[in-house]
From Swiss-Prot:
UniProt record similarity statement: Belongs to the glycosyltransferase 2 family. Plant cellulose synthase-like A subfamily.
One Pfam family recorded for the sequence: Glyco_trans_2_3
Transmembrane segments: 66-86, 405-425, 428-448, 521-541, 546-566
Top-level EC class: transferase
GO biological process: cell wall organization
Name of the protein in its database record: Probable glucomannan 4-beta-mannosyltransferase 5
UniProt keyword list: Cell wall biogenesis/degradation, Glycosyltransferase, Golgi apparatus, Membrane, Transferase, Transmembrane, Transmembrane helix
One GO MF term attached to the UniProt entry: mannan synthase activity
Length: 574
C-alpha cells in the first residue's frame, strides 16, 4: 500500500469511528443487548440494562466537546468558502469584462510582424533578411516518451523561422536505451534535412525536468540565443507560433515571458478527459486571463511559452527545489520586475492524462509543489523591492493561499467530512448560505467562463470533490515538506495517433487487469463512509437533508475507486 493509500485509509477510519459513535449515541445502532448478554449472561431487551450509561456519557461528550470542536471547523470552512467564492467571482468577472471590452495584449504591448513571412521566404531573400530574426532555441524535455516523441519533434521542426536562426534542442533523460536510440535517430533524420537540431543527454536525472532545462542552457550554442521556447514532449505548436510570440519580446524589453493556451487532442476520449478539459479551460479562460488583464500575476504553465534568456538568468535560472520549476521561475522573475503576456487566442495542442492514476499523480505533483513553493517564497515575496504591495498581496493571498491551500482544504474537509458527519451530530450548526448558496455561486461563475462545457460542470464538481482528497494530502505534504514532497513521476502519454480520426475511440488496447489491482482503497473507503452517512440521513431524518448530495459524492468516490473513469477499454469505463 502506498503512503497516499495509507493516509486515505487513516482518514476513513477516523471519520468512520466518529460516525459509528454518533450512530450509537442517537440510537441508530444499539449494541446494549450484546453487551448485556456477554457481560451478564442474561437476556435483556435492547436499550435497557447497565450498558446505557456509556451512551449517555457519549451524548454528553458529543455536546460538550465533539460538536464544539467541529463547529470551529465549520466556521473555519465558512471563512475559506467565502475566500474561494470571492476569488472565483473576481477571476470570472475580470476575464468576462476583458472579453467584452476587447482587451488584447497588442493594445498594451508593442507588436510588429517580422519581415515578410516565414522561413522559406527568408532563405530566398538571403542572409540579410534572416538577420532580422533573433536567435531562438526551442527546448523539448522528454523522458521515455515512446508514444509522443515524433509528434513534438516533428511539430517543432515545422516552425516557421529561418533555419540559421533556430536551434532545436531535444533534452532526452530517457532511461530506456531502445527509446533513447529512437529519439536520437529521429533527431539525426531531421538534421539531415538541414535543421539545426541538437540531441542532448546527461548522466543521471538530478533535478528532473528543471535539471534538464538548466543543463540545456549551459551548452555554448544555447548562450547565443536571445529567446528560448519550451514544449513538453506531448505538445504540438502550430507553424506560426514563434512568429506570433517572439515580436512581443523583441519590442518590449521588460517582458520576460509570452504564454500560450493549451488545447487538447484527446479531450473527447473519456469522461475523465472531458472533466479535465473543463478544469483547464477555466484555468486558462479565467485565472490566466484575469492575471494578465489586470497586470497582476499569472504563472508560466511549464510549456507552450517563450522566455527571454536574460530574464531566466536574472531570476536565478532553473531550480529543482520543488516539483513546479515553472511556477518557481515565474514567481522569481516577477519579483525581479519582469512582465508576462498571456495570449489566449494562441493555442497549442497537447495531451491530457487518459487514466485516473496518471491524473492523480500529475495533480499531486502540481499541488504539492505549489504548496511547497508557497512555504519557500513567502519571505522573498514580502521583501521584494521591484513589485508593488498590491502585487505581493495578489501573489501570496490569491495565487498561493486561496488556490493552493484553501481550495483543496475546504473542498475536502467541509464537503467530505463535516457535512457527512453533521447528519449524526444534531448539535452541529451548518449555515445554509455556506453549504448551499456558496457552492451554487461557484457552479455559476465556473459555468459562465465554460459555456461549451456546461454539461460537464456538475460532473466536474463531483470529480473535484474526489480530487480534493489527493490535493489536500499533497498540499499538506508540500507545506510540511514530508518525505514525498519532492517526488517526480512523469505523466504517462499515449499519443494522439492512439485514437481514431474522430478523437473518440481508444485504439490502444491495454492488458486486462484483475479487479483487485484496479481498486483505489482511499476512494473506496470514503465512498463507504459517504453512503453510510447518506443512508443514515435518509432513514433518520435530522434538521438537514443532505442524502442526495452524499449519495452522489459516494457514487463518485466508488466509481473512481474502481478506476471506472478513463481509457480502460477492456473494462466498463466511461
Amino acid at each position: 500500500m502506498e503512503a497516499g493509500e495509507a493516509a486515505g485509509a487513516v482518514l476513513f477510519l477516523l471519520a468512520a469511528a466518529v460516525s459509528l459513535l454518533a450512530a450509537v449515541s442517537t440510537g441508530a445502532l444499539d449494541f446494549t443487548y450484546l453487551v448485556t448478554v456477554v457481560g451478564e449472561g442474561s437476556s435483556t431487551s435492547p436499550g435497557s440494562g447497565g450498558g446505557a450509561w456509556w451512551r449517555e456519557a457519549w451524548v454528553g461528550a458529543r455536546s460538550r466537546a465533539v460538536a464544539p470542536a467541529l463547529q470551529v471547523g465549520v466556521w473555519a470552512c465558512m471563512v475559506m468558502s467565502v475566500m474561494l467564492v470571492v476569488e472565483a467571482t473576481y477571476n470570472s468577472a475580470v476575464s468576462v469584462a476583458a472579453r467584452l471590452v476587447g482587451w488584447r495584449p497588442e493594445r498594451w504591448f508593442k507588436w510588429e510582424p517580422l519581415g515578410g513571412g516565414a522561413g522559406a521566404g527568408d532563405e530566398e531573400k538571403g542572409e540579410a533578411a534572416a538577420a532580422a530574426y533573433p536567435m531562438v532555441m526551442v527546448q523539448i524535455p522528454m523522458y521515455n516518451e515512446l508514444e509522443v516523441y515524433k509528434l513534438s519533434i516533428g511539430a517543432v521542426c515545422g516552425l516557421k523561422w529561418p533555419k540559421e536562426r533556430l536551434i532545436i534542442q531535444v533534452l532526452d533523460d530517457s532511461t530506456d536505451a531502445f527509446i533513447k536510440n529512437l529519439v536520437e535517430l529521429e533527431c539525426e533524420d531531421w538534421a539531415s534535412k538541414g535543421l539545426n537540431i541538437k540531441y542532448a543527454t546527461r548522466s543521471g536525472r538530478k533535478g528532473f525536468k528543471a535539471g534538464a532545462l538548466k543543463k540545456g542552457m549551459e551548452w555554448d550554442y544555447a548562450k547565443q540565443c536571445e529567446y528560448v521556447a519550451i514544449f513538453d514532449a506531448d505538445f504540438q505548436p502550430e507553424p506560426d507560433f514563434l512568429l506570433r510570440t517572439v515580436p512581443f519580446l523583441m519590442h518590449n524589453q521588460n517582458v520576460a515571458l509570452v504564454q500560450a493556451r493549451w488545447v487538447f487532442v484527446n479531450d473527447r476520449v473519456s469522461l475523465l478527459t472531458r472533466i479535465q478539459k473543463t478544469f483547464l479551460d477555466y484555468h486558462f479562460k479565467a485565472e490566466q486571463e484575469a492575471g494578465s488583464a489586470t497586470f497582476a500575476f499569472f504563472s508560466f504553465n511549464g510549456t507552450a511559452g517563450v522566455w527571454r534568456t536574460e530574464a531566466i538568468n536574472d531570476a536565478g535560472g532553473w531550480k529543482d527545489r520543488t516539483t513546479v520549476e515553472d511556477m518557481d521561475l515565474a514567481v522569481r522573475a516577477t519579483l525581479k520586475g519582469w512582465k508576462f503576456i498571456y495570449l489566449g487566442d494562441l493555442r497549442v495542442k497537447s495531451e491530457l492524462p487518459s487514466t485516473y492514476k496518471a491524473y492523480c499523480r500529475q495533480q499531486f505533483r502540481w499541488s504539492c509543489g505549489g504548496a511547497n513553493l508557497f512555504r519557500k517564497m513567502i519571505w522573498d515575496v514580502l521583501v521584494a523591492k521591484k513589485v508593488s504591495s498590491l502585487k505581493k498581496i495578489y501573489i501570496l493571498y490569491s495565487f498561493f493561499l486561496v488556490r493552493r491551500v484553501v481550495a483543496p482544504a475546504v473542498a475536502f474537509i467541509l464537503y467530505n467530512v463535516i457535512i457527512p458527519v453533521s447528519v449524526m451530530i444534531p448539535e452541529l450548526f451548518l449555515p445554509i448560505w455556506g453549504v448551499a448558496y456558496i457552492p451554487t455561486a461557484l457552479l455559476i461563475v465556473t459555468a459562465i467562463r465554460n459555456p461549451e462545457n456546461l454539461h460537464t460542470v456538475p460532473l466536474w464538481i463531483l470529480f473535484e470533490s474526489v480530487m480534493s482528497m489527493h490535493r489536500l494530502r499533497a498540499a499538506v505534504a508540500g507545506l510540511l515538506q514530508l518525505q514525498e514532497f519532492n517526488q517526480w513521476i512523469v505523466t504517462k502519454k499515449v499519443g494522439n495517433n492512439a485514437f481514431d480520426e474522430n478523437n473518440e475511440t481508444p485504439l490502444l488496447q491495454k492488458s486486462r487487469k484483475r479487479l483487485i489491482n484496479r481498486v483505489n482503497l482511499p476512494e473506496i473507503g470514503l465512498s463507504v463512509f459517504l453512503i453510510f452517512c447518506a443512508s443514515y440521513n435518509l432513514v433518520f431524518h435530522g434538521k438537514n437533508s443532505f442524502y442526495i448530495n452524499l449519495y452522489l459524492q459516494g457514487l463518485a468516490f466508488f466509481l473512481l475507486g474502481l478506476n471506472c473513469v478513463g481509457t480502460l477499454p477492456d473494462h466498463c469505463c466511461f
